[in-house]
């Protein structure tokens, strides 16, 4: 548990959406965060004024989506890149507690279909997705000594009423 923490930062988000011919579209999103979160509990502590554990100064993401849609179905291919910058795993910001930055690349392919009654009213939406997470099979720990999975796959089928 921490006492007093002083937090300052900046968040920047942007999104572009392009409508292309023949029902195609392209979307791009970028997010960046700069954050200082320093312990200001007790000036006598060795870690007074240090960045608190596991809070990076820099982090961000980039997402791209290429898709196609019509009145009752859509398909899209998604790419995402997530970056978490250097940080420390304990209260003291010393070399021994330093934690390397990490990043991942992920891909997904999604299809969605609206299923209708004969009168045209939508009954439900069927969605199928195939995800490939950590595409480059990076070794990284979000928390020290808790390694995240290397490349992994997920297949999802869902129905929404």
Labelled PLM ranges:
Residues 1-2, 44-52, 92-97, 140-145:
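Extracellular loop and loop/strand-boundary signature of outer-membrane beta-barrel proteins
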Residues 8, 24, 58, 103, ...:
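Exposed loop/turn and edge beta-strand positions of beta-sandwich/beta-sheet ligand-binding modules
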Residues 84, 96-106:
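Outer-membrane beta-barrel transmembrane domain signature
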Residues 1-87:
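Gram-negative outer-membrane beta-barrel transporters
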Residues 58-66, 103-111, 151-159:
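Feature captures outer-membrane beta-barrel proteins of Gram-negative bacteria and organelles
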Residues 71, 82-90, 110-161:
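C-terminal beta-signal and adjacent terminal beta-strands/loops
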Residues 19-21, 55, 100, 121, ...:
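Surface-exposed coil/turn segments at beta-strand junctions on protein surfaces, enriched
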Residues 74, 102-106, 127:
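Active-site lining segments that contact anionic ligands and/or coordinate catalytic metals
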């Amino acid at each position: 548990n921490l006492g007093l923490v002083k937090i300052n930062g900046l968040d920047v988000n942007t999104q572009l959406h392009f409508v292309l011919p023949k029902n195609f579209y392209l979307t791009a999103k970028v997010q960046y965060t700069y954050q200082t979160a320093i312990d200001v509990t007790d000036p006598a502590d060795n870690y007074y004024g240090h960045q608190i554990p596991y809070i990076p100064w820099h982090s961000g993401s980039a997402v791209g989506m290429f898709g196609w849609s019509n009145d009752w179905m859509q398909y899209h291919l998604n790419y995402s890149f997530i970056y978490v910058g250097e940080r420390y795993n304990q209260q003291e910001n010393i070399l021994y507690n330093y934690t390397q930055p990490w990043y991942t690349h992920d891909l997904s392919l999604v299809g969605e279909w609206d299923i209708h009654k004969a009168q045209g009213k939508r009954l439900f939406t069927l969605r199928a997705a195939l995800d490939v997470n950590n595409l480059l099979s990076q070794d990284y720990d979000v928390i020290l000594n808790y390694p995240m999975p290397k490349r992994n796959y997920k297949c999802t089928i869902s129905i929404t009423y």
